[in-house]
From Swiss-Prot:
Catalyzes the conversion of dihydroorotate to orotate with quinone as electron acceptor. It is a peripheral membrane protein. Binds 1 FMN per subunit. GO terms for molecular function: dihydroorotate dehydrogenase (quinone) activity. Monomer. Pathway: Pyrimidine metabolism; UMP biosynthesis via de novo pathway; orotate from (S)-dihydroorotate (quinone route): step 1/1. Its cofactor is FMN. It comes from Flavobacterium psychrophilum (strain ATCC 49511 / DSM 21280 / CIP 103535 / JIP02/86). This is Dihydroorotate dehydrogenase (quinone). It is found in: Cell membrane. Keywords: Cell membrane, Flavoprotein, FMN, Membrane, Oxidoreductase, Pyrimidine biosynthesis. One of its GO terms (cellular component) is plasma membrane. GO terms for biological process: 'de novo' pyrimidine nucleobase biosynthetic process; 'de novo' UMP biosynthetic process. The gene is pyrD.
Length: 350
């Protein structure tokens, strides 16, 4: 029904307006008595064999929702009813910011893709924290970044602010230095500044662990992951492996959006921003395979980028991903994709 009726209607309108309309619609429907149970019965696959333990966390299934869909933690409870094993919120910054000027989100229907240049639009980390205080059982990842006006030499401070604010309310962290839509952000992917940033967060992580142990509770350090671009060279990817081992972060999310426009058909290919969707499928899988093989599977990888069908998901898992995430594929294919992937994982005993 989604692809035949709902998607054609939604795709007649501006993508960003549709996004917020969909948010309001899901929130409204979820308030109707009984609808939560209906959603779960339609989209959830409850099977112990789907459970995964990765970087010390227990996931009810390996299919998550990628960051960017629920930036401000406004809908994570409702979205979890679509069968996701975990929800990643963000990217969040210390201060709320409008992001880049509109129009900044574009469909490329001929390519089953999206280009966005949103620019970390969000209400600020503290607003999200207030919503996360009401969380009851949804496994949450916190994707953090820097404000647009913060110069790179002060970027670490922004990440620290977000880390401190979210620490008690998310299950894992994602350091986002790979978005192409914040000026100069990708420069932080270079080995020296990235190592410094991650070491700072890890030191803070360990200190928080000690403080917790001295107090009434003991929850341990939170897993910190790094989200990388698909546009890195093999040499840069080898640097990433070294950085993970040196800083002892928990793992990698591969990959973010790409600045490549190779092979695109849509007229919207001329738009600036990060490309996501089907054109990214093969490259993100290549990056996952490279990292897994060259590191000897030394750390977990969350695979994301161009998962539009069951086979796309299986290929990423077979390439070395421990978990996977959807975003653009969820928009193009609808919520039934989550259930289909989980059922195929069971079928293949992955």
């Amino acid at each position: 029904m989604y692809k035949l009726i709902i998607r054609p209607i939604l795709f007649c309108f501006d993508p960003e307006k549709v996004h917020y309309f969909t948010f309001s619609l899901i929130r409204t429907i979820a308030k109707i008595p009984g609808f939560t149970s209906i959603f779960k019965s339609l989209y959830e696959v409850n099977d112990k064999r789907l459970e995964r333990e990765v970087f010390g966390l227990k996931f009810k299934n390996p299919v998550g929702l990628a960051a960017g869909f629920d930036k401000d933690a406004k809908l994570y409870k409702e979205l979890s009813n679509f069968g996701f094993g975990f929800i990643e919120i963000g990217t969040l910054t210390p201060k709320g910011q409008e992001g880049n000027p509109k129009k900044r989100l574009f469909r490329l229907q001929e390519d089953s893709a999206i280009i966005n240049r949103m620019g970390f639009n969000n209400g600020g980390v503290l607003e999200a924290v207030e919503r996360l205080k009401k969380n009851n059982g949804v496994l949450i990842g916190g994707n953090i970044g820097k404000n647009k006006l913060t110069p790179n030499e002060n970027a670490t401070s922004d990440y620290e602010i977000c880390f401190d604010a979210l620490y008690d309310y998310v299950d894992y962290f994602v350091v986002n230095v790979s978005s192409p839509n914040t000026p100069n952000l990708r420069e932080l992917q270079e080995k020296e500044p990235l190592t410094q940033l991650l070491n700072t967060l890890q030191n803070k992580n360990q200190n928080k662990q000690k403080q917790t142990r001295d107090g009434a509770q003991s929850s341990g350090a939170k897993p910190i992951l790094l989200k990388i671009a698909p546009d890195l060279t093999n040499e840069q990817l080898l640097d990433i492996i070294d950085i993970v081992k040196t800083t002892k972060i928990a793992g990698i999310i591969a990959t973010n959006t790409t600045i490549s426009r190779e092979g695109l058909q849509s007229i919207n290919r001329i738009e600036m921003g990060g490309l996501s969707g089907k054109p990214l499928t093969n490259r993100s899988t290549e990056v996952i395979r490279f990292l897994s093989q060259k590191s000897n599977k030394a750390f977990p990888i969350i695979g994301v980028g161009g998962i539009h069908c069951v086979q796309d998901a299986i290929e990423k898992l077979e390439a070395g991903a421990s978990l996977i995430q959807l975003y653009t594929g969820f928009i193009y294919e609808g919520p039934a994709l989550v259930k289909a992937i989980n059922k195929e994982i069971l079928k293949k005993s992955l």
